[in-house]
Amino acid sequence: MLTRQRRAAAALAARWLRCASGSAKYAPSPGAFAPPPSSLYDVIILGGGHNGLVAAAYLARAGLAVCLLERRGVLGGAAVTEELFPGFKFSRASYLAGLLRPQVIQELELTRHGFRYLPRDPSSFTPTAVHGPHAGRSLLLGVDAAATAASIAQFSHADAAAFPRYEAFLQDVRAVVQPLLDGPPPVSSRGGIAERLGALRRVRASARAALASPGTLEGLAELMTAPAAHILDRWFESDVLKATLATDAVIGALTSPRTPGSAYVLLHHVMGEAAGVPGVWAYVQGGMGALSGAVAAAAREASAHLCTNADVAEVLLDASGGAEGVRLRGGAVLRAKAVLAACTPHHLFRELMPADAVPPTFAKHIAHVDYSCG
C-alpha cells in the first residue's frame, strides 16, 4: 500500500514539475496571434512580463504609441496565475509581492484596476519532529511581535530578546540601500542637471541613514559578502530559528547558508514593502497573475497595444546598427523609433539579433550568463 502511495506521489510530483517548469517558457502557444492595428509605433516592447507591462503602461501614459509583443498566450511572464491542474489555479513562478514599489502602484492606479495585497500572517511555520529534542513544538513568525517572541522563547529566551534587534539591524541597512534603488541607474556621465541632482539627493538620503545608525555600513559590507550562517550564528543560538531564517538566504538560489555572499539574500528579503509596511511581503488576491492583469489594464487604458501569441523572430537594425523594428515568425514586420527588450539578454542577443551585430567579447559574456539559480 505504501509503495503504491509513493508511486502516486512521485507521479504527481513529476507532473507538477512538467507543468510548472520554466522550460515551458518558450513553448508554442495554442492561441492565434491577432495583429496590432498598426505597423508603426514609437516603441515596441519585447516581452510581456511585469517589467515589460510596467514599461508599456508608463510609456503609453506619456503619450507614446506602444506595442508590446508576448510570445505566450498569457501576459505576466513569471507573474502569472495559471490552471496547472483542472480546477486549480496557481501562481506559477513568482508567488509573493513586495518589491513592487508603492509609487508604481499609486501612479498606475493599480488598486483601481483590481490589485489587492493579502497580508501574509503568519509569515512562516516551522514544525519539529514529535520524537525529536523539541518534542513536536512549532515556530510561528508573524506580524504580532509579542506572539512571535513567545513562539521563539519556546526554543530560546535569549533568541526571543535578540530577534527584534536583528530585525532592527536589517531595517537600518535597508534604510541605507533603499534610496539608491528608487532611482534609475546612472547610464552615462553625460546625464542632465535634473538627473544628477536626483542622484545626489538619493546619495544624501543614503548617507543620512548611514550616519543615523553607526555600524550600518560595516553591516552592509558583511551582508554583501558573508555566508548567511555566519550572520545567524552570531545573532542566535536556536537551530530551529536559524533554520527558519536561513530559508530567506537560499530560496530561489542553488546555494547553501554557508556559501559566501548568501547573507545578501537575507537583506533582499527585507527590501520588500507591502501596503505601506517596510520589510513585508504579501500575497496578491487572485494570484500573481492579478498583479500583471492590473498593470496590463493600466497600459490598455492608456492605449498601449498588448499582443499575445506574438512570436518575434528577429530585431531589425538600420544602417547605423540601431534597432528600427521587428520581424515576426509569420513574416509580418513592425517598425518603431525604439525597441525595448523586456526579455533575457540570452534571448535578445543570441536569438533575436544578427550575429554580426553583437561584438564577439560581449556575445561570449552573454553566452556564459548562468540562469540556473533564477
Annotate each PLM feature.
Residues 26-28, 33-192:
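N-terminal glycine-rich phosphate/pyrophosphate-binding loop and immediately adjacent elements
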Residues 50, 309-313, 330:
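Conserved SAM/SAH-binding loop
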Residues 216-230, 274-297, 307-309:
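Short beta-strand to alpha-helix junction loop
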Residues 281-302, 315-316, 326-374:
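Glycine-rich loop(s) and the adjacent beta-strand/alpha-helix scaffold that form part
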Residues 307-324:
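A conserved short coil-to-beta-strand element within the FAD-binding core of flavoproteins
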